[in-house]
């Protein structure tokens, strides 16, 4: 073989080697690209899930804040109710002199101002007298026989007023019910 033929053969072998290496290099790069695409897809999925979780947390916090604002006077209302009961008991006392009447008038004014303040905060008395008994709003402490005037499950007497804040019962009405 001549030198020229040897050189051509050598070049041919090198080209075949380069072609083989190039093909395997392209295959490696294609595999790498697929792996990177899969990883990117996984990261996008994680990102979307994290974003959704943050949105859910934000909504949950917003709802909790709204509930806190809506029911902020619940504890205060529960603490004031015994004082209202005492003022109402004081109003029930019979007085015979002018000084007693004056004192009773002052108590009435205080009771009225507290009642107005509670209404402004959303705290209201639960209607009970003559109403149909509702175990969600009333607590029956005694029963009496029903009559023609008072049908069964009717409240005949209120022993202690009940109060509610918006749709929550702060204290049920303690009542006597006809059975």
Curated annotation (Swiss-Prot):
GO cellular component terms attached to this protein's record: cytoplasm
Disulfide bond sites: none
Keywords carried by this UniProt record: Chaperone, Cytoplasm, Stress response
GO biological process: protein folding
InterPro entries, per the entry: GrpE, GrpE_coiled_coil, GrpE_head
Matches recorded under SUPFAM superfamilies: Coiled-coil domain of nucleotide exchange factor GrpE (SSF58014), Head domain of nucleotide exchange factor GrpE (SSF51064)
PROSITE patterns: GRPE
Keyword Cytoplasm: yes
MF-aspect GO terms: adenyl-nucleotide exchange factor activity; protein homodimerization activity; protein-folding chaperone binding; unfolded protein binding
Biased composition (Basic and acidic residues): 1-10
One Pfam assignment: GrpE
Location (main, coarse): cytoplasm
Region (Disordered): 1-23
Source taxon at top rank: Bacteria
Localization, UniProt: Cytoplasm
Membership in a protein family: Belongs to the GrpE family.
Chain's role: Participates actively in the response to hyperosmotic and heat shock by preventing the aggregation of stress-denatured proteins, in association with DnaK and GrpE. It is the nucleotide exchange factor for DnaK and may function as a thermosensor. Unfolded proteins bind initially to DnaJ; upon interaction with the DnaJ-bound protein, DnaK hydrolyzes its bound ATP, resulting in the formation of a stable complex. GrpE releases ADP from DnaK; ATP binding to DnaK triggers the release of the substrate protein, thus completing the reaction cycle.
Subunit (UniProt): Homodimer.
Protein name: Protein GrpE
Gene, per the UniProt record: grpE
